């Protein structure tokens, strides 16, 4: 860089132009470094108009959540792809319901395997007494397995939902625990903004000094709904502590979709990243459908040359009444085999829509691939379009089941297991289940509360290949019979063994051959990928 002053303080001689240009560009090289040449650039033409800001999760999510919920629900109700995506996740994650498989820590509790098995069987029997009945529901509409489906679908659609666990006595019910599902919209800020600011309430959730949720504010009705009783003429809010102050009992379960950021209070609808794509696809599909319908219409327009002429068929007397459409001065209507009379001098020119469009299917497939990538649902499963080879279809299902298993574990830890632990505490306190030390030591309580939850199996594209693969895994010690039985059929191994024993005894008593066997299997040649 050239000098501006000499050592004696006099002004230095002018530098050559190239040196001055270098001196001016030097600071720019320091500032324009690293990501400023790429994603952080404001100089590139592709980035120059992109302005973005950073803020916390509450600003990004809670301030926009009402719009996201409304649009997500509208897409679920009107867009087939959105409806299919949510129902596909719900059906594969929950299916007919996740069933309890009690698994206590027998070694820690000092129990033999036989004693533990008896205790688990009795506990599952008592659990079914409560879970299989609609009495478990606050509204007495659904059993526990149907509530799982509602929780999953509501959470996917709205971003989150809330579950309350009140104790309500009812005639004919052994247990008092009830499960109530609260839609996301009902948990919102009270009208008193000053009070909400004092207590750090946002999105209807009050947080403490460490950022922990300590209470939710529940409206007595949906804020956007019409009052249907005198009790709900005015929207009022109730503060519900998430944990009991005296016992620490869970009063509220916050079932939330993927937590994306620290200090996030509310969940985001799963369709949020693809709302625009789904809406545009819906508009395009509607336009193509209407164009195809119009191109399929056959309508005859009759032009009358002058008022004196009687027109086609002698004044229209030969036309069936159902085929005649009285002209509207504002519009004409197309119909199937319809005949429309035109006024004197009027003519009709119809543009050929050239439908169906040959590009429609390709465009829909391309957009659905993008949507499926965001939702973690392979394109084949999103559209139920399995036309590729066995290997490609199986790869798509395996990829999808990574997500289904993750969401199944999430549902278990967020909803099923906490509700089971609340029910077990009541069963022990009522003396219907014997669990020594349950309330004395948290470690003992956790040992009694151990459980696994099994749902519907994944399903198989080629049952023969899947069964042979399972046999090989078990024979070589890579897996267990219990695990393979659960993954292939959704059933527990001990249940299968007991059922088979009864079946074989029944067959023998009838004089039938109860022996099973396997036939030699010739592996089919793997299909080549298309």
Where are these regions (language model features)?
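C-terminal anchoring/interaction modules
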Residues: 2-23, 368, 395, 410-530
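Short coil/turn segments at secondary-structure boundaries
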Residues: 142, 166-167, 291-297, 382-386, ...
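Surface-exposed loop-to-helix/strand elements on domain peripheries
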Residues: 117, 134, 338-461
């Amino acid at each position: 860089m050239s000098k501006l002053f000499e050592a004696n303080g006099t002004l230095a001689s002018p530098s050559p132009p190239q040196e001055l240009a270098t001196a001016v560009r030097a600071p720019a090289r320091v500032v324009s470094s690293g990501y400023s040449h790429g994603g952080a650039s404001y100089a590139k033409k592709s980035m120059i108009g992109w302005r973005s800001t950073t803020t916390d999760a509450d600003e990004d999510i809670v301030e926009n959540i009402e719009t996201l919920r409304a649009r997500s629900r509208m897409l679920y109700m009107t867009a087939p792809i959105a409806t299919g995506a949510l129902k596909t996740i719900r059906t594969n994650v929950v299916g007919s319901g996740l069933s309890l498989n009690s698994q206590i820590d027998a070694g820690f509790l000092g129990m033999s395997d036989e004693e533990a098995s008896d205790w688990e069987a009795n506990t599952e029997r008592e659990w079914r007494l409560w879970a299989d009945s609609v009495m478990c529901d606050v509204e007495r509409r659904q059993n526990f397995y149907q509530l799982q489906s509602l929780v999953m679908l509501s959470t996917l659609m709205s971003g989150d939902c809330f579950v309350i666990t009140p104790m309500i006595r009812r005639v004919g019910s052994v247990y008092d625990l009830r499960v109530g599902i609260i839609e996301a919209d009902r948990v919102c800020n009270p009208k008193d903004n000053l009070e909400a600011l004092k207590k750090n309430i946002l999105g209807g959730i009050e947080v403490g000094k460490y950022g922990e949720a300590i209470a939710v504010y529940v409206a007595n009705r949906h804020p956007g709904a019409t009052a249907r009783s005198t009790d709900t003429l005015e929207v009022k809010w109730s503060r519900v502590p998430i944990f009991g102050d005296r016992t620490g009992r869970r009063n509220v379960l916050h079932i939330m979709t993927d937590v994306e950021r620290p200090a996030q209070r509310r969940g985001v609808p799963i369709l949020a990243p693809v709302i625009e794509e789904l809406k545009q696809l819906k508009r395009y599909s509607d336009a193509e459908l209407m164009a195809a319908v119009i191109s399929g219409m056959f309508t005859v327009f009759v032009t009358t040359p002058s008022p004196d002429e009687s027109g086609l068929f002698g004044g229209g007397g030969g036309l069936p009444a159902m085929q005649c459409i009285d002209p509207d001065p504002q519009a004409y209507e197309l119909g199937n085999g319809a005949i429309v009379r035109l006024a004197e001098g009027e003519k009709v020119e119809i543009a050929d829509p050239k439908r169906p469009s040959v590009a429609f299917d390709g465009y829909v497939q391309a957009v659905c691939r993008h949507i499926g990538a965001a939702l973690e649902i392979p394109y084949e499963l999103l559209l139920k379009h399995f036309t590729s080879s066995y290997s490609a279809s199986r790869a798509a299902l395996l990829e999808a089941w990574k997500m289904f298993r993750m969401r199944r574990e999430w549902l278990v830890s967020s909803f099923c297991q906490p509700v089971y632990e609340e029910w077990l505490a009541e069963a022990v306190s009522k003396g219907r289940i014997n669990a020594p030390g349950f309330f004395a030591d948290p470690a003992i309580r956790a040992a009694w509360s151990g459980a696994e939850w099994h749902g519907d199996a994944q399903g198989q594209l080629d049952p023969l290949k899947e069964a042979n693969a399972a046999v090989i895994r078990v024979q070589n010690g890579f897996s267990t019979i219990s695990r393979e039985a659960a993954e292939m059929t959704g059933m527990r191994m001990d249940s299968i063994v007991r059922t088979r024993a009864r079946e074989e005894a029944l067959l023998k008593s009838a004089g039938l051959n109860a022996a099973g066997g396997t036939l030699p299997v010739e592996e089919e040649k793997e299909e080549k990928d298309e």
